[in-house]
């Protein structure tokens, strides 16, 4: 029996075990998938030996990279890993994001406001670059590459018709938290996309919905990146 899993913290919100267990059953694969919630990566070498492959989630998508034997070129370019197979790191988050947001985009959607600068954000940035879209980064720690939340003015909101939450804010169990942006400037011309998928309607998306915006959660992104991860493990 091949063993798979997901490493991160927290994992109580994760759908991955259910998703992959069902997939293994449907495809007649002799495998199991478990959750490996960890406070750090001190036993990552042991896990890499024990598991044929695994997913990596918050907060380890970047910090796991030095432990890997090899890294795929795309994951290296992104600067984050969410899939490991036999010690090699890959990134399928960008595929999941690109394929899940594309059906919801209008011709007028050209500029994207990305909330957060972590591992998921890096995959989103890469996907948008492949799609030919421009973006502005927002960080709790503004720098030469990212503005701060205090810098999000009405003009910034109006000039970015797509807002993507790449932070864990609003994720179970902290369902009432949300990124501190001026939601009063969101209109029905906007698309709010949340990479969080549990709960399905986060506080961030509820604010957008109340303003008439299109809203999309991260559930399709999860499944699409998982399908791409499965293909890596299978092949």
Put a short name on every predicted segment.
Residues 145-216, 220:
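Rossmann-like adenosine-cofactor binding region
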Residues 10, 141, 198:
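Residues in the short beta-alpha loop(s) of Rossmann-like NAD(P)-binding domains
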Residues 2-104:
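Phosphate/diphosphate ligand-binding glycine-rich loop within oxidoreductases
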Residues 8, 91-94, 101, 105, ...:
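Glycine-rich adenosine-cofactor-binding loop
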Residues 99, 115, 214-235:
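Active-site capping/gating segments
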Residues 130-147:
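NAD(P)-binding Rossmann-fold cofactor-contacting core
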Residues 53-63, 120, 168-171, 198:
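Short glycine-rich anion-binding loops that position phosphate/pyrophosphate groups of nucleotides
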